[in-house]
Swiss-Prot record:
Active site (record annotation): 193, 347, 377
Gene Ontology cellular-component terms listed: membrane
Organism listed in the record: Homo sapiens
Pfam families: Abhydrolase_3
UniProt name for this protein: Arylacetamide deacetylase-like 3
Origin superkingdom: Eukaryota
Gene of this entry: AADACL3
Amino acid sequence: MWDLALIFLAAACVFSLGVTLWVICSHFFTVHIPAAVGHPVKLRVLHCIFQLLLTWGMIFEKLRICSMPQFFCFMQDLPPLKYDPDVVVTDFRFGTIPVKLYQPKASTCTLKPGIVYYHGGGGVMGSLKTHHGICSRLCKESDSVVLAVGYRKLPKHKFPVPVRDCLVATIHFLKSLDAYGVDPARVVVCGDSFGGAIAAVVCQQLVDRPDLPRIRAQILIYAILQALDLQTPSFQQRKNIPLLTWSFICYFFFQNLDFSSSWQEVIMKGAHLPAEVWEKYRKWLGPENIPERFKERGYQLKPHEPMNEAAYLEVSVVLDVMCSPLIAEDDIVSQLPETCIVSCEYDALRDNSLLYKKRLEDLGVPVTWHHMEDGFHGVLRTIDMSFLHFPCSMRILSALVQFVKGL
């Protein structure tokens, strides 16, 4: 009996070691870390840990133990939360939607700005716990009331469930600002990555709601703003740079939007949409809208291939503005509030921010733009990661705080 147990334990150890070595080798063969990225060794370690969790999640999914998103979320939520004595944190629900409310402990009679925060993670990972440190710091340093929304996500809930959850939670919050001591003239929606996309959509959805306090500003941190064109300069230049590599981008898009993975090459070549659609949106998505300095390194303009009709029938949801807020009509975008956009140089989604910035500015919407020359996608999440912390994360937080204080 004991011999059998020892054999099983040894086999498990060898298998675990093999998985770890495979992840490390795969990292060095497939991932590119530019010299200009701050702390490249840290980034390699962070990406290997990230990939190891994804790989084990995939293994457990194949063994039908649990899904990859469930495993990843379980692991990411294991570390205990650190509470700041100057911030009061309250957990409750708007109906079935869990939220965390962060309020400065020092009581005053004056109303404070309110920030509704939607966490990132591609609808796959991320949670109220993973973004607790960000929201707590944002609350304390900007002297604001922060509401973090715990929307439903994969594997059970796909697009547009996360967006609808966040919209419902935001409306609940806007209808009860007095209860939280929030100034109705200073409500901000904010999100990073997938959460940035949600912030953009929520803002657009609320422009025609005169029954609610008007959103004062939106903060979009390396946001996913369109799902049409995956051949922008940044996609070509940065698709092998962690943490958002091409393989994870595909997983995120195909799982959230419920596409068949067989369309990957078709979408890459732009053959998933008809010529008239590309022509219609060229004025907003064309590379001429991106400053020349961002096209100097490894960009090649590629014509879109003829449409694959079967692919178009399945993936046309990318034309929904709840999926691609960047292509909303002018009469909506022109009504949007003051905007703060944060982009990172080493991010495949960088150009989403640049294109939306131009759209907003062309329509007269004030934009504050912060571009992190040494930043990468997901860097803000490292703000509380001790030895894996990147200084760039503090600069992003500082930019957000100054923006909120200036409203």
